[in-house]
Amino acid sequence: MMFGPWGNKDEADSIRVIHRALDAGINFVDTADVYSAGESERIVGQALAGRRDDVVLATKFFMPLGTDPNNRGGSRRWIIRAAENSLRRLDTDYIDLYQVHRPSQDTDVEETLGALTDLVR
């Protein structure tokens, strides 16, 4: 499901869809910071208000967010910033599964994995 300008543009309807899914027993929600430039995460966060503990919440980072070349990739700096931004948009203090949307050819995999390990701490 996509929410925001890339998908369902009706925010209230998007929240109803998520609520119906949760009521039907779905307990895994996956989104990404790049989906609708963060709007999908914001809508998911609103929908999960009061129900966060009932859901395994996943999101992703890597893809460009805007034209700034520093707002993308697998560098430690970007991963930490992207995680903080996702937490804020999702209105939560933890993400159950934080995923790399795709590997970065510009960043050593050890840097990416090190940043992800530090986020767990």
Region locations from a protein language model:
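P-loop/Walker A phosphate-binding loop and immediately adjacent motor/lid segment at beta-alpha junctions
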Residues: 52, 61-64, 116
